[in-house]
């Protein structure tokens, strides 16, 4: 049984300009004291074409963590535009929150992110070279995708077989029925969105 359950994630300052920091309010619960730190990361997917464009925006160690419910705000700087392919700067991508214990990832929360120009002229006639200062970031906060992995929480047991499952306790938070629609300015097709998110949610 997992010793840590993520109860809720709230996306703060959303939507916001591209260069604003990412901010997530994370609430989690430990069923018993943890002797080692939890490592949290925020990862920005720079391109659906290759993971080489993924950027770890920040990582933080939390712990040792006593049993009980805990909440903290995880903030990370915006991604480095120089590491994002021009073709992927505008449109839909993904941001991930991961947590590991003893070097083993046990939960991954993924959100769709839409980067678009707020000015009509720029939307209709986008510059060849993206102008990140004019982009607005909008995280689809209502529809995260959560994947959990079985890990070895103890020192004296063999490593468990890796597996993943949706967290039933977060069903209201994790509904994947609704995806971004073109009517809301999310122009990427549902199929390509699913492929992009699945590829990052299923890897360890």
UniProtKB/Swiss-Prot annotation:
Gene label: ASF1A
Outcome after substituting residue 108 to E: Reduces interaction with histone H3
Official protein name in the record: Histone chaperone ASF1A
Mutation effect (residue 54 to R): Reduces interaction with histone H3
Chain positions found as Phosphoserine: 192
One BP annotation, GO: muscle cell differentiation
GO MF annotation, one: histone chaperone activity
Oligomer and partners: Interacts with histone H3 (via C-terminus), including histone H3.1, H3.2 and H3.3, and histone H4; the interaction with H3 is direct. Probably interacts with the heterodimeric form of H3-H4 taking the place of the second dimer. Interacts with the CHAF1A, CHAF1B and RBBP4 subunits of the CAF-1 complex. Interacts with CABIN1, HAT1, HIRA, NASP, TAF1 and UBN1. Found in a soluble complex with NASP and histones H3 and H4; the interaction with NASP is probably indirect and mediated by H3-H4. Interacts with CDAN1. Found in a cytosolic complex with IPO4 and histones H3 and H4. Interacts with CREBBP.
Tissue spec: Ubiquitously expressed.
Species of the source: Homo sapiens (Human)
